[in-house]
């Protein structure tokens, strides 16, 4: 299960999606989320799904990486579907046992919510899969740079977010190593009910926290050795510049978001 968590991982490539400016990808993700949460009909969901499919195919990220990233949230997806099935009012499917508690409106709501969660996760994961942590930090800093006038530490905030995102795969790998070492000593993490499994994970927490603090200390030492002083006087080796492709992609996602909002108000 731990190996299925792919959030924060970066898959290098030279595709159009990889070469896009990180600011473009961040803005496109925001527009994509706006479009997704305003989708209410089969037509609008199909439009969002089509755009997501084009992005995935263009990025050449293997489908197994995306589906593997969905495995840890299967329980959340199933819980959401069940809640919508049984607790959405409307016309019952049939007057027979459990079916009397399931409505046609609940079925539609469950399908819509499951699709929304899956497409939301796949769309946001695609951002980290195709954008390196350094590029993501630079993009966030440039997008939020107007807030520097309010004396907000934008560079530090962007750096913190990037480091936190980058440490997710590292901590997952460390947890997997600790669990393997515990299993070699006779620990059992797979048998018993959910409470027994949770109790079995307690011995992992102490070495995991120690490892996390040690890595944080090593990172802080490395940054100090390189005379890191935040964003003060910092320059970039590769200056971010919008290209024609960035404007075209941004325009396409803007049209998608506005178009779906219009279709929503038209009842389509």
Q: What does each of the following model-derived ranges do?
A:
Residues 63, 79-84, 99-102, 227, ...:
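A general structural signal for short secondary-structure boundary/capping elements
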Residues 14, 37, 61-65, 97, ...:
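Membrane-helix interfacial "entry" motifs
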Residues 1-44, 48-59, 142-145, 149-152, ...:
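Transmembrane alpha-helix interface motif
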Residues 25, 64-74, 246-249:
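Alpha-helical transmembrane segments and their helix-start/interface "positive-inside/aromatic belt" motifs
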Residues 41, 45, 60-64, 88-96, ...:
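Transmembrane helix-loop junctions in multipass membrane proteins, especially transporters and channels
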Residues 55-59, 64, 72-76, 80:
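Extended cationic-aromatic binding surfaces that line active-site or macromolecule-binding grooves
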Residues 70-187, 194:
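Juxtamembrane/interface alpha-helical elements of multi-pass membrane proteins
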